[in-house]
Amino acid sequence: LVAFLLGLLSAVLPAFAVAKKELWEKPSQLLLPKPPRAGAKIVLERITPLWKRLSFTEKVTMRNIFRYKQRMFMTLFGVAGSIALLFAGLGIRSSVSNLNQQQFEDIIHYDMIVAKQPNTSSALDEELTKLLDSKDVKEYLNVHFETLQKIAGSNKDTQEISTLVFNDRDDKLVDSYVSLHDRDRNKTLKLSNDGAIISEKMAKLLNLKVGDTITVQNSQDESVKIKIAGITEMYMGHFLFMNASYYQKAFGTPSVNNANLITLAEPTKQNVENMAAKFINLPNVYGVVQNNNLKLQISTMVNSLTQVIGILITVSILLAVVVLHNLTNINVSERIHELSTVKVLGFYNNEVSLYIYRETIYLSIIGIFVGFGLGQALHQYMVSIIPPDRIMFDPSIGLATYLLPAVLIGFILIILGFVVNNRLAKLNMLEALSSVE
């Protein structure tokens, strides 16, 4: 209903306003082209050093652009709007297309987390160790794994934070299992005794920065204050990373190795599932978190978004075509008498076409740059509201996101340029000049 009312309003109100304005004029005035205001100067004419350097045709173009202000703003906003939509659509597609690779190849290097039951016998522990030392496992690392809770997000939901605590002696091995990287400062992060490293999405939900303190709840519903020593790039889930020394400082108790980060020799989807089944069947294994399930969640979301983004891109392209085509046709139709006069004065066909089409080209170029600014703002807004609380989109924008919209508008302008040129080449000058009388 809201969409229908907005569509009706945007279609009917402009038509009503324009018709009402025109009908106030006398019929005799409506039959004649509207003359420019006598002695009027445009803004550029007042900038003397710049105005003197313009050629005659450029001065004519600038005067015509500012003479038809309504059409100028329509072209600017039309091109800028289509560029902004196309930029945002391509930007979102770029932001989500490589999420799995960024999360599970560039950042997370382990294939699964195996959590152990507490207080198990040494015989059961040996069975687990035997499987860990098998040829199917490339490497593994003993860590403390704990799930903390924090209320965050727009709906004030309870967020689960996966906490990984590494032994102090294993500091140099952390990079083999997870790459801790500050995306904004392009800096590699290291664990310290003075705080924990939090995932970027959680930091954004809580508006945290380095040096702040976060209060979380542990499994016993006890409040624990944790100082933020760094913010790491992370696209799936909420994480806290710390070493054993800081864990004991924050929690008041030493950490206990109760889990293993495991990297498999063959990390194929089927092999990960088979190994996860082997681990979960061991009596002293509490649970297994495998990356396959997380990859599937991201893939499902990306596929759904890709279809919606495809529609957005298609609509933005159609908008650009419709806006430029209609405005060009209106421009030619309303100024047919002026163009016939120019042609009678001895201008060649290409010169006549550029006489009027140069305005569209200049305005489209300005509209492209305005659209880039609007598109960046729209992209950042969409990146912040579309993903759920546990997922972050890559906010960076690739070069292709800038090039494709500009190339597309350029292609549309070239096609329409040929259309305008052919139309003006067939123009009957005498008929157009006599039509006013």
What are these regions (language model features)?
Residues 56-192, 200-201, 212:
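Juxtamembrane segments of multi-pass membrane proteins
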Residues 92, 96-105, 271-318, 331-333, ...:
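Peri-transmembrane interface segments
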Residues 24-42, 425-437:
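Short cytosolic juxtamembrane segments of multi-pass membrane proteins
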Residues 1, 20-21, 368-411, 417-431:
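Short helix-loop junctions at transmembrane helix boundaries
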Residues 111-117, 202-203, 229-231, 254-282, ...:
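A short beta-strand structural signal in non-transmembrane regions
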Residues 186-246:
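Hydrophobic secondary-structure segments that place a key small or acidic residue at a functional site
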Residues 1, 310, 322-362:
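Interfacial "coupling" helices/loops that link adjacent transmembrane helices in transporter permeases
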Residues 107-108, 190, 232-273, 292:
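Small-residue transmembrane helix packing/gating motifs
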